[in-house]
Amino acid sequence: MRIMWYMARYHQMRVSDATIYRILKRHGVNRLPGKPGRRKVHTKRYNKQVPGHHIQMDVKFLTFIGKKGEKVRRFQYTAIDDATRVRALKIYDKHTQANAIDFADHIIEKFPFRIREIRSDNGHEFQAKFHWHVEDLGIRHAYIKRGTPQLNGKVERSHRSDGQEFYQLLSYKGDVDLEAKLVEWERFYNFHRPHGAHNGKTPYEALREKL
């Protein structure tokens, strides 16, 4: 579906899903490499239609290979607006409450709307210091129930997109390069990448319609 939107948006070509699938299958690229398929679990979706009323926040764990063959661990903090799918991303070298607090301050400055609620899992980075920092800023902080990541499903799904469309194509050359490329990816995701939830519109196109 997304390829069809790209063709229409950027190349003015109308191609059906079936045609795209046949071409990909012919060339052996109709499936991305990765984990075998899993049975889909149907869960209730929660949608907030006002920008900023509900922000999902989570951390994506990253492992790269450094110049000397060593493992380099980094942490992508992610916030996604439920109503528009507008996202903010930032890389840290540690997985801490201090960095979660810094990221909360970052998205308050970055997002072009008032944030009313942040929803997170029960990870140690989102505990008391983070919780009360956010609450003191006038933002409600809610925890999802343990063992129910689907309640933060939008940020989880966006992390899969990061893996498939960004990190899978990335060659790690150091933190400065990584941070610069992540800024480019964030901008592409928000302003140029068609989104299924908005029938091919980008998150910022959806945002303009809701403001």
Q: Which residues does each PLM region occupy?
A:
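RNase H-like polynucleotidyl transferase catalytic core
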Residues: E117-N122, D136-K154, L170-K173
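Short small-residue beta-strand/loop micro-motif enriched in glycine and branched aliphatics
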Residues: V86-K90, A142-I144, Q168
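Acidic/histidine-rich, metal-coordinating catalytic segments
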Residues: H95, F113-Q127, G147, N199, ...
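An active-site-proximal beta-strand-loop segment
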Residues: M57-R87
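Basic, flexible linker segments flanking DNA-binding modules
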Residues: M1-T63, W132, T148-P149, T202-K210
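Buried hydrophobic side chains on well-structured beta-strands
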Residues: I3, R85, I118-R119
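Active-site beta-loop-alpha junctions of metal-dependent nucleic acid enzymes
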Residues: V72, L89-F113, E117
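C-terminal domain-tail junction helix/linker
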Residues: A128, L137, S161-L211
